[in-house]
């Protein structure tokens, strides 16, 4: 039931407040659209309710992606990269309770996350990456050394998932 309510709300918003042709022409998603999508929960579809997200299932996330894809590919890319390969999903799976409490509410409400994998000489092949994250002597940090070529959602992101090699 909650999934249906969200999908209907998203469908209505897309129809009445977005212009996919204009987004395609300009290559820009209006800031107001990003803000509105965050306020309606579209940035936190799978983020648990306890962290301010909608807490919906993968099925409902897929339904939203299909709806977005049938309306505007750019919005689909923004939301799917943010929630799947950006910060929220890795944080849900691998983050500490403290990290989840600090960051997930921000992403659920509209802060956008980015993803950085691609490198100049190796493309997007993680097995050949040259960027590294080596533990500090005390093991508390992993300083990153290297260079990434681009980042999905980077223009609008407040946090970025960086994919490096590590010795462990």
Residue ranges and their predicted role:
Residues 103-104, 121, 130-132, 149-152, ...:
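A generic local secondary-structure boundary/capping motif
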Residues 134-142:
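A short, structured loop/turn motif at beta-sheet edges
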Residues 93-95, 134, 162-165:
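Short beta-strand-to-turn element immediately C-terminal to the catalytic PLP-Schiff-base lysine
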Residues 48, 118, 163:
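Conserved residues at the C-terminal ends of beta-strands
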Residues 141, 145-168:
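A short core secondary-structure module
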Residues 114-135:
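A gly/ser-rich beta-alpha-beta helix-loop segment of oxidoreductase catalytic cores
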Residues 56-58, 125-127, 153-158:
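Short glycine/proline-enriched turns and hinge-like loops at secondary-structure junctions
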Residues 1-82, 89-113, 124, 142:
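Amphipathic, small/basic residue-rich leader segments at the start of a protein or domain
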């Amino acid at each position: 039931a909650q999934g249906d309510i969200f999908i209907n709300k998203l469908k209505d918003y897309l129809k009445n407040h977005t212009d996919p042709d204009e987004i395609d022409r300009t290559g820009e998603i209006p800031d107001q659209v990003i803000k509105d999508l965050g306020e309606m929960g579209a940035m936190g579809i799978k983020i648990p309710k306890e962290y301010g997200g909608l807490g919906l299932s993968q099925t409902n996330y897929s339904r939203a992606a299909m709806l977005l894809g049938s309306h505007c590919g750019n919005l689909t890319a923004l939301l799917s990269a943010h929630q799947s390969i950006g910060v929220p999903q890795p944080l849900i799976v691998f983050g500490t309770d403290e990290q989840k409490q600090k960051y997930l509410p921000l992403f659920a409400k509209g802060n956008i996350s980015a993803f950085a994998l691609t490198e100049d000489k190796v493309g997007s092949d993680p097995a050949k990456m040259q960027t590294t994250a080596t533990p500090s002597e005390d093991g508390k940090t992993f300083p990153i050394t290297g260079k990434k070529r681009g980042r999905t959602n980077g223009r609008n992101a407040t946090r970025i998932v960086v994919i490096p090699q590590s010795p462990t």
